């Protein structure tokens, strides 16, 4: 469920050494499955462990995860990175905003997952997003752009060279993508 590097484990052991005996680590997701999802790490006093928590045992400490956060922390990774500017704990949880779907889920769910977890975070850098409207009977993913992508002069390149290539690579059963958006250039447009 959660991978913790050796450097991060050592950091946790150091932090826990100054806490009351029995204190462990809790990893959680606030607003799981939503665009506003945020991951967190906190101390977990012994009296705050719930019977429904997932208990992950590491060499010198344990991590507890509440049942609501657990599916959103699948494939999460915690690292402790040190560089010339200092050090910091990093937590990457690719499924925090969108729960990973099963490999045998319907095509529309799998495509939507890739859009939400891989494509939209990139588009968000420009204030944009894309929504899957449908998959047609002839295997085209019909998309609608929003935010900074609506009216952007680069939207055709983004659609064909970025999104379509990625989706066709991951889903060979698709024939392509179509843009349903009525693009209106304005101040919101990125380019």
UniProtKB/Swiss-Prot annotation:
Identify the cofactor(s). Answer: [4Fe-4S] cluster
Q: Name one Pfam family in it.
A: Fe-S_biosyn
Q: Name one GO biological process term.
A: iron-sulfur cluster assembly
Does the record bear Membrane in its keywords? Answer: no
Q: Does the keyword Metal-binding apply?
A: yes
Query: Keywords in UniProt for this one?
Result: 4Fe-4S, Iron, Iron-sulfur, Metal-binding
* Coiled coil region boundaries: none
**GO molecular function per UniProt:** 4 iron, 4 sulfur cluster binding; iron ion binding
Gene3D superfamilies (UniProt xref)? Fe-S cluster assembly (FSCA), HesB-like domain
Annotated binding of [4Fe-4S] cluster, by residue: 149, 152
How cofactor binds (record note)? Binds 1 [4Fe-4S] cluster per subunit. The cluster is presumably bound at the interface of two monomers.
Family, according to the entry, reads as follows: Belongs to the NfuA family.
Protein's job: Involved in iron-sulfur cluster biogenesis. Binds a 4Fe-4S cluster, can transfer this cluster to apoproteins, and thereby intervenes in the maturation of Fe/S proteins. Could also act as a scaffold/chaperone for damaged Fe/S proteins.
Under the subunit heading, UniProt states:
Homodimer.
Q: What is this protein called?
A: Fe/S biogenesis protein NfuA
**Per the UniProt entry, what species is this protein from, by scientific name?**
Hamiltonella defensa subsp. Acyrthosiphon pisum (strain 5AT)
């Amino acid at each position: 469920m959660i991978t913790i590097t050796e450097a991060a484990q050592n950091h946790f052991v150091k932090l826990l050494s100054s806490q009351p005996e029995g204190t462990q680590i809790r990893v959680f997701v606030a607003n799981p499955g939503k665009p506003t999802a945020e991951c967190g790490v906190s101390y977990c006093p012994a009296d705050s462990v719930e019977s429904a928590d997932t208990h992950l045992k590491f060499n010198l400490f344990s991590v507890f995860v509440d049942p609501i956060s657990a599916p959103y922390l699948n494939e999460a990774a915690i690292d402790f990175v040190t560089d010339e500017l200092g050090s910091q704990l990093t937590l990457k949880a690719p499924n925090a905003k969108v729960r990973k779907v099963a490999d045998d889920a319907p095509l529309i769910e799998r495509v939507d997952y890739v859009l939400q977890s891989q494509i939209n975070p990139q588009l968000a850098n420009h204030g944009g997003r894309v929504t899957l409207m449908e998959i047609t009977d002839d295997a085209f993913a019909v998309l609608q752009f929003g935010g900074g992508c609506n009216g952007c002069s680069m939207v055709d390149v983004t659609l064909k060279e970025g999104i379509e290539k990625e989706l066709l690579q991951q889903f060979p059963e698709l024939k392509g993508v179509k843009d349903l958006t009525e693009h209106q250039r304005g101040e919101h447009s990125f380019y």
